[in-house]
Amino acid sequence: MSVQPHHHQLGDWPLACGHTIADARISYLQIGDANPDGSNLILVPSSYGAQVEDLAWLANAVFDPGRWCIVIAGQFGNGASSSPSHGAMGLAEQGWVVRHRDNVAAQKRLLQERFGAERLAMVYGWSMGAQQAYQWAVDEPGWTERICCVCGTARTSPHNRLFLLSLRQALTADRHWNGSGFNAPPEQGLRTYALIYASWAASQPFFRQIDEAVEEHVERHWLPHYQRHDPRDLIAMLDTWLAHDVAGGGDLQAALGRIRARTAVVAGSHDLYFPPDDLRADADAIPGATFHVIHSELGHRAGNPHSSPIEQGHLRRITAELLAHPNSS
């Protein structure tokens, strides 16, 4: 069993935007052993800003690694897979926009070449990971037995776009932005970015119960997470999120209606990014999908409860129910 992150080389990788990543690579982490027929593979695409090791808490807390082989895959732009910080790609200003269809294709290549896989027991994702799970079900129905989409939607909503654009503007308004990158670390831009991010990621009840000033809380607990990233990578992932639409600009209801995977859609009661009504609408469009709400003051982070046993228990129950039933398609 591998417990360290690895990279899988993809060669020159064409993107839907028309550019090609030279010598592309995808980061991944394997927890648990694959069955000889690959029937126990669970793919976990990464969320915004996450390294694959950040999601390793799912083993044992949600999935039994003695039964399931959990493959956590890093999306392009996360700093470990091919990213602007490597010089591998540019930003939207130069016409570079990675779409989740590109991420799904790279993950499929990883699974084929590293694991000999032809099918996945489940694609499980939170936030941008949920977006990729939806994309898997739309693009690769023959591969995707089940999807569990936690705190994420099948298309970026207009209101969610405003949040993302405010984050992008916080970074590119910094005095060190030069139109294609940064001449120096955008310290003020990152501080503004962290304040905006925190105000949306956690809920109003969450901030009412903290025992320090909110600006100090953000400085201590939020800002360091974003400072570990090259800001160009943060922007690249924002652009992927902004471009997200499993229907590619077409009929979303029709695209979701064609999903054959057994599906669970999981909302957070206080999620300000992806409110329950938005997730319920996606679930209602997918044949046979189940809809769940985790009642939690963690806000959007209720779907990534790495240190919150109550929320972990909800996710463990939902995924166990999903995995207990074969896909009838």
Where on the chain are the PLM-derived regions?
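Catalytic active-site module of serine/aspartate enzymes centered on a nucleophile-bearing elbow/loop
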Residues: 280-281, 288-329
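Conserved hydrolase catalytic core segment
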Residues: 118-161
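N-terminal cap/lid subdomain of alpha/beta-hydrolase-fold enzymes
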Residues: 27-87
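Conserved alpha/beta-hydrolase "acid-adjacent" motif
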Residues: 272-278
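Conserved acidic catalytic loop of the alpha/beta-hydrolase fold
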Residues: 90, 101-122
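Alpha/beta-hydrolase-fold enzymes
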Residues: 143-224
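Short beta-strand/loop motif that positions the catalytic acidic residue
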Residues: 259, 265-267
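Catalytic-loop region of hydrolases
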Residues: 1-44, 329
